[in-house]
Structure formats: C-alpha cells, structure tokens
Amino acid sequence: MTKQVVEERSGQGRAAEHAVARNYKDTIFRMLYSDKKELLMLYNAESGGNYTEPEELEVVTLEQAIYMSMKNDVSFILDTSLSLYEQQSTVCANMPLRDLMYVAKQFETLAAGRDIHSSRLIRLPSPRFITFYNGKREQPERLEQRLSDAYCGRGSAADGEPNLELRVLQLNINPGYNEELKRKCPTLFQYMQYVECVRRYERDMPLREAVETAVEECIRKGILRDFLLREKAKVINMSIFEFDQELHDRTIRNESWEDGV
C-alpha cells in the first residue's frame, strides 16, 4: 500500500481519532492484564505454574514516560522470578536489546537505596522475557530471540558463549498456534477472538466502524463481555490507535521493501 493511499484513508476524522488515542498509555493487552487474577492465570498457562493467590504477584511495571520507547506491557515479580510480558503485532528483531535496556532500569529501581559497592550480594529476581505475538506476518509457534544475534563479532568467553546474553521467548497467539496455552487462559483466547473480529470487519469498513461493530458483536457473543462493557469507550479509542499503528508499521516495511532498503 502506498503512502498516498494511507494518507487518503486517514483523513481529518481519523487524525482526530488518532490524536485522542495517543493520550492513552495502555494497550488492550495491558488493560486486560492489569487484573492480577487474569495476569496470574496467564503466568500459570505460559510457565506451567500452579500459583493460586493473585496477591502474591507484585506488579512492578515502570510507568515513566521517558521509557515508553522501551516499555513493556507488564512486569511483575512472583516468587523469585521477574517476568516481562510484551504483546507485539509486528515482528521486532531488536526485542532482546529493548528488554535489556528495560530490565537494566528495572534492576536499578529494585536495587535503589542499597549499596552496590558492598561486599554483601544484592539478590535480584531471575528475569524472564516473553513476547505474545499476534501480527499478520507469518511466524513460528515459538521463537527464541537472542541478544547475541546482534553482536558484530564473537568476542566472547573461552567456551564460545557470549559474555552477555539475553533470551526472549516469542509465543505466536494467532489462530492455530499455541492453542493449549489459550485453552488454559480463556482471556487470552477471547482477546484473540476480539482482534480477529476487528480485522475481519476492517477489510470492508472504515476502522472506527469496524472496531465499534466488533465490540458490539463480542459483547453479544460473551467474548470479553464484562471487560468490554466496563471499558467500552477506552477500548474503542485504544483499538483505533493500535490498528492504525499496525497499518502504519506494515506500510513502512512495504515501502522500504519497494525502495530496496
């Protein structure tokens, strides 16, 4: 799709909607999993855990606007682990680097007020990096991304392992992928039903109409019903922003490919 087509599609009304939506820091995914009960269910589903007390989960997501470019959707500590969850509708080869920058700030925050020059070891939770991918570009069911893939040389330890490594597990949650995960976490399954509903209507309708129609259909069918009834206006505005951003990202990639970049 050319830039001209995208601009024509946007229009003044779309620009106004986009401006409104940009005021929200949340994403639909983050809104859903701001509920500790739902977040614990997702954690148990993806990790194989069997935790039962949502209050044992401590949400530690960084909120500072300056870190929005490297943000993750939700970070939380449970037992001895720090989990960083991110939902992505586009493929990001730099996710390990983004997570490195983010977790460094997270560790700095967790260690605040403690003497890092002390002979006593400062204990830190073991980090886990999970990306939930639901974009249109074909991806495998599971993909491990490594920070070392970005290294220009192999200047590593004697055993051949990098001196600094970070692994991100990307889980494809599109229809037909990781169905067992979604079976164990009904909210994740219904989230993808909503996303697919918007995409289906978006093919034949203006984006706002597609989102509003999808919201009403999901409410009728009991898909995220309570959440959509409670957060309807915010979900509509946020969805417009998210799907506009998804279109923008795809357009930039297509134009780069056409230009031979």
Kindly give the residue locations of the regions a language model identified.
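Elongated, amphipathic alpha-helical interaction scaffolds
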Residues: 1-261
